C-alpha cells in the first residue's frame, strides 16, 4: 500500500519539474570593476557562462563639457578638451583648435604644424602603451604593464618639458602652439636610488635639446616594441584569449559608425591622416596597418603596428624641425598674445594682452566641423559661432561613444571571460564617452 500511495506523489513531482522555467541570470559588471576601464556599468544577462544580452549604462562621468565650453570665451575652453579623453590629450585639443582657426580664417605657421603632427603621434604612442599594458593586465599578463610604462614615462617627461603638465597640457592654441620646443630636457637628480654611474646612464639621452631626446627615443623604441611582441604576439595564452574573440565584420563596423583601429582592424582602410590630411600628415611617409579577421588579436596587431608608424612620423618631424627654425604662432595680436618684450614698451600690446585673456576674441559667425584621427578613432568638434566671443554651440564627436553602442551586438554568444577582452579592445575612456 505504501508503494501504491507513493506513486502519485512522484508523478506530481515530475509534473512540477516540467512546468519550471529556466531563467537567465543578471549580472552587474562594474562600475567598480577594475576591468571596466572607468565608470562603465554593464548589465549582463547570462545563460550559464554565455552572454545573452549586454546593456551598457553610461553617464557616471558626465560633466557637461559642451555646455561649459559655451559659457566661456573660445580660448578658455582648450583645457576642457584635455579632460575628455584624458589619455589622448593633445589630439582632443587639435580638433577644437582647428575648428576655431577655420572660422577665423587663419593657419598656424609651418613649424607649428610640424610640432602638432609630432605631438599627435607622441600622444598616439602614449595612448597605445596605456592600452597595451592595461589590456594585457586584464587578461592576466602582468609584466607587460611594467614594460609599457617604462617608455610611457619618457614621453610623459616630454609633455612636462613642453607644457609644464604631465597630462593636461593645453599646449595647442588657435594660430599655433604655446611656445617653441625647449633647448633642454629635465634630468634625474641624485638620490639614494640613483647616483654615480646609474645617474649618468639615466641622463645620457637628456644632455641635449628635446629634439635630441626624441631622436634618441625614435632610435631605441622599435627594439622596445619587439620586447612587447616577444611577450604577447606568439604567447599561447594571449592568442587563446584574443584570436576569434570579438569578431566585427566590416559591414557591422561601418553600420555602428566605428572609426580608428576598430574599423581598420576589420580590414577597412579609413584613416583621416591619409584620406583627409591635416597639419603636416601629407608631408610625412607612413602606412596604415589593417587587420584581416576583425577580432581582438587583429586589433592588438594593428595598435602595435601603429606605434611603429607613429615612431616613423616622429622621426621625420624631428629631422625637419632641426633643419627649419621659425615662428610657432601667428603674428596677430587679436588672436595670439604679444611678446613679453613688447608689452614693456608698447601700451597697445599690453591692452591686447589684457583683452585677450579677460574677454577673448570674437569669432566670425558660421559653423564648421573639424575632425582628427585620434588614437581611439575619429574625434570631431562641431562648432557654431554667432559672432560673439563665446561659442553658440559646441558638439564633440567621441569615438568611444559609437564603439560602446555596439557592445550588445558584439558580445552576444561569447563567454563572460571574453567580455573583459572585448571591453579592453574597445579602448574606452569615459571622459569622452560621457563628456
From Swiss-Prot:
* Location within or outside the cell: Cell inner membrane
Q: E.C. number, please?
A: 7.1.1.-
Gene Ontology MF terms = NAD binding; NADH:ubiquinone reductase (non-electrogenic) activity; quinone binding
Q: Per its UniProt record, what InterPro entries does this chain match?
A: NADH_Q_OxRdtase_suD (IPR001135), NADH_UbQ_OxRdtase_49kDa_CS (IPR014029), NDH1_su_D/H (IPR022885), NiFe-Hase_large (IPR029014)
The reaction(s) this protein catalyses: a quinone + NADH + 5 H(+)(in) = a quinol + NAD(+) + 4 H(+)(out)
Could you name the domain of life of the organism this protein comes from?
Bacteria
Membrane topology is: Peripheral membrane protein
The yes or no answer to whether the keyword Cytoplasm is present is: no
> What keyword terms does UniProt attach to this protein?
Cell inner membrane, Cell membrane, Membrane, NAD, Quinone, Translocase, Transport, Ubiquinone
The protein's predominant localisation is membrane
Q: Could you tell me which SUPFAM superfamilies the record lists for this protein?
A: HydB/Nqo4-like
Residue spans crossing the bilayer: none
**What GO cellular-component annotations does this UniProt entry give?**
plasma membrane
* Subunit record text: NDH-1 is composed of 14 different subunits. Subunits NuoB, C, D, E, F, and G constitute the peripheral sector of the complex.
Query: What does the similarity note say?
Result: Belongs to the complex I 49 kDa subunit family.
Summarizing the function annotation, the protein's role is:
NDH-1 shuttles electrons from NADH, via FMN and iron-sulfur (Fe-S) centers, to quinones in the respiratory chain. The immediate electron acceptor for the enzyme in this species is believed to be ubiquinone. Couples the redox reaction to proton translocation (for every two electrons transferred, four hydrogen ions are translocated across the cytoplasmic membrane), and thus conserves the redox energy in a proton gradient.
Q: Could you tell me what this protein is called?
A: NADH-quinone oxidoreductase subunit D
Q: Which organism is it from?
A: Xylella fastidiosa (strain Temecula1 / ATCC 700964)
Amino acid at each position: 500500500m505504501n508503494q501504491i500511495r507513493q506513486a502519485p506523489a512522484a508523478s506530481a513531482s515530475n509534473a512540477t519539474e516540467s512546468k519550471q522555467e529556466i531563467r537567465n541570470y543578471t549580472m552587474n559588471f562594474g562600475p567598480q570593476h577594475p576591468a571596466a576601464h572607468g565608470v562603465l556599468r554593464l548589465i549582463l544577462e547570462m545563460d550559464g557562462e554565455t552572454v545573452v544580452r549586454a546593456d551598457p549604462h553610461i553617464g557616471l562621468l558626465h560633466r557637461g563639457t559642451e555646455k561649459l565650453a559655451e559659457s566661456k570665451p573660445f580660448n578658455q575652453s582648450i583645457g576642457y578638451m584635455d579632460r575628455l579623453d584624458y589619455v589622448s590629450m593633445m589630439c582632443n585639443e587639435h580638433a577644437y583648435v582647428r575648428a576655431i582657426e577655420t572660422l577665423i580664417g587663419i593657419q598656424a605657421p609651418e613649424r607649428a604644424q610640424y610640432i602638432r603632427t609630432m605631438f599627435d603621434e607622441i600622444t598616439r604612442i602614449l595612448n597605445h602603451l596605456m592600452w597595451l599594458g592595461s589590456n594585457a593586465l586584464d587578461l592576466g599578463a602582468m609584466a607587460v604593464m611594467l614594460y609599457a610604462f617604462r617608455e610611457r614615462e619618457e614621453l610623459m617627461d616630454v609633455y612636462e618639458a613642453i607644457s609644464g603638465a604631465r597630462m593636461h597640457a593645453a599646449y595647442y592654441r588657435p594660430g599655433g602652439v604655446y611656445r617653441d620646443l625647449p633647448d633642454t630636457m629635465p634630468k634625474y637628480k641624485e638620490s639614494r636610488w640613483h647616483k654615480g654611474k646609474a645617474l649618468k646612464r639615466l641622463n645620457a639621452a637628456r644632455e641635449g635639446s628635446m629634439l635630441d631626446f626624441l631622436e634618441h627615443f625614435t632610435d631605441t623604441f622599435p627594439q622596445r616594441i619587439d620586447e612587447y611582441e616577444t611577450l604577447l604576439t606568439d604567447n599561447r595564452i594571449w592568442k587563446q584569449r584574443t584570436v576569434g574573440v570579438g569578431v566585427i565584420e566590416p559591414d557591422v563596423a561601418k553600420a555602428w559608425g566605428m572609426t580608428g583601429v576598430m574599423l581598420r582592424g576589420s580590414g577597412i582602410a579609413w584613416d583621416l591622416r591619409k584620406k583627409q590630411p591635416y597639419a603636416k600628415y601629407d608631408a610625412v611617409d607612413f602606412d596604415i596597418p589593417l587587420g584581416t579577421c576583425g577580432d581582438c588579436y587583429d586589433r592588438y596587431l594593428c595598435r602595435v603596428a601603429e606605434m611603429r608608424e607613429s615612431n616613423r612620423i616622429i622621426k621625420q618631424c624631428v629631422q625637419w624641425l632641426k633643419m627649419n627654425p621659425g615662428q610657432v604662432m601667428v603674428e596677430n595680436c587679436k588672436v595670439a598674445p604679444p611678446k613679453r618684450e613688447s608689452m614693456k614698451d608698447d601700451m597697445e600690446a599690453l591692452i591686447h594682452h589684457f583683452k585677450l585673456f579677460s574677454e577673448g576674441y570674437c569669432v566670425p559667425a558660421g559653423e564648421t566641423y573639424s575632425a582628427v584621427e585620434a588614437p581611439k578613432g575619429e574625434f570631431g568638434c562641431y562648432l557654431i559661432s554667432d559672432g560673439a566671443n563665446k561659442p553658440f554651440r559646441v558638439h564633440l564627436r567621441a569615438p568611444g561613444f559609437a564603439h560602446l553602442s555596439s557592445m550588445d551586438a558584439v558580445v552576444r554568444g561569447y563567454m563572460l571571460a571574453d567580455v573583459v577582452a572585448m571591453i579592453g579592445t574597445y579602448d574606452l575612456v569615459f571622459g569622452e564617452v560621457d563628456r
